[in-house]
Amino acid sequence: MSEAGVTFRAATAEDSRKIAELFSISSDGVVNYVWMTLASEYPGLEPVEIGAIRYASEEGNFSFTNCVLAEREGAVIGQLCTYPVAPAGAGGPDGEPVDPVLEPYARLDVPDTLYISSLALLEGFRGMGLGTRMISIARDQARERGLDALSLLVFEQNAGALKLYEREGFREVDRAAVVPHPLINRTGDVILMTAPV
């Protein structure tokens, strides 16, 4: 199958459920853990339903406004979600402790980059050049924002994604051990990578 017939479009609030589902895939369950920690704010909802509510917002890093969807024949087959990482010294959390399971992800960032928070494709649409196309879109977004680099996190066990990112010029900057949890589908290390635009 080729990239032919695949279109890209800005996400809308109505896409929030699909965004949450794809984000769950790209994070290998990490966001399911995040959404589970918010369950007291959303009683009776499953993690992906909580994610959909959060992505329906127009504000914040985790908003549909930061996502581009890939479609084929009217069906969403993938997504790219990005947001800028704050400049160094711009402030941040007010000293609240970080959840130990999330600490590795919280500390791995590169200021002044466009962070790819989710690059996901459904199983039957991988290996078609769509990931490369999405990284190209992210590079365009970074240039539009005046940023000169991209950043992302990837699990060392995700060989397919690592191969794509290395081919696209990403290099390892740092890594941290994954804290095991039943909702997180990976072990080993999570790797912080950057690439020029």
Describe the role of every protein-language-model region.
Residues 113-114, 135, 142-153:
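Conserved GNAT acetyl-CoA-binding A-motif
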Residues 75-78, 160:
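Glycine-rich acetyl-CoA-binding "A-motif" of GNAT/NAT acetyltransferases
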Residues 28-55, 65-66:
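Conserved GNAT-fold acetyl-CoA-binding loop/helix
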Residues 148-151, 155-162, 167-168, 178-197:
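C-terminal "cap" of GNAT-fold acetyltransferases
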Residues 121, 127-144, 163-167:
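Conserved acetyl-CoA-binding loop-helix of GNAT-fold acetyltransferases
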Residues 56-69, 85-90, 115:
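A short helix-loop-beta-strand connector motif used in the catalytic cores of GNAT acetyltransferases and
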Residues 81-118:
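Conserved acyl-donor/pantetheine-binding loop and adjacent beta-alpha core of acyl/acetyltransferases
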Residues 7-22, 27-34:
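A short beta-loop-alpha structural element at the N-terminal edge
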